[in-house]
């Protein structure tokens, strides 16, 4: 009996001796994973993030029928009834993500640089200088729709970063794409000027002039060399969006949407109250 107890004690101590280091190693690994979090310096590429967004959008569209009806789904169904020919929002979102993914690959492959070198003087592009004005005016209309889509996408992507890192030729192309050679101005009236004077203005890009004073003065006879001396004036448009400027049909649609929104909100709040009443009664009975 004594020998058997001694053997059992030795066996238990031997197992404890073997299990002890294993427990320490496992505990050490858990502590390392808990308190040590290495910093990942590598950022996932934008194409991979876009693929993930596309996959999530597709999964969300397939599982949307399993989720309870929300307020946004109710409003989308209402608009689908009002506009039967309207496109599906989920399909538009997925196609938009695929388009962004394709444009990201084109931008990462350096296609924008190829376009700029092809149409806008490679020497000025490599030296980080401004594009010649005549070359910009002549070759910008030659850009295709795919080239303009890539340029718009590059502008939206690069404007999120540090603008000091942008090249001068890209900034010039950005400005010309957004405003043209007339600059950020509105409501230019060309009817009161002669064709020769109008053609002279169109041949002078990036100049400062007061077109409103010229169009009010029918006897104005200004040489192209004197155009740069005309005072620059910014014209502010006083037109604003007001309720009175909306047509009756749009007012009816907006009023209907507001009415349906209020009705859905009241219905949801009533359902929530009916769910809370049984819970309160059960708590009172339990007490």
Swiss-Prot record:
The keyword Transcription does not apply. Residues 1-24 form a transit peptide. GO terms for cellular component: mitochondrial membrane. Keywords: Membrane, Mitochondrion, Transit peptide, Transmembrane, Transmembrane helix. Its main location: mitochondrion. The chain crosses the membrane at residues 250-266. It is found in: Mitochondrion membrane. The keyword Transmembrane helix applies. It is a single-pass membrane protein. Belongs to the GEP7 family. Involved in respiratory growth and required for cell survival in the absence of prohibitins or GEM1. This is Genetic interactor of prohibitin 7, mitochondrial. It comes from Saccharomyces cerevisiae (strain YJM789).
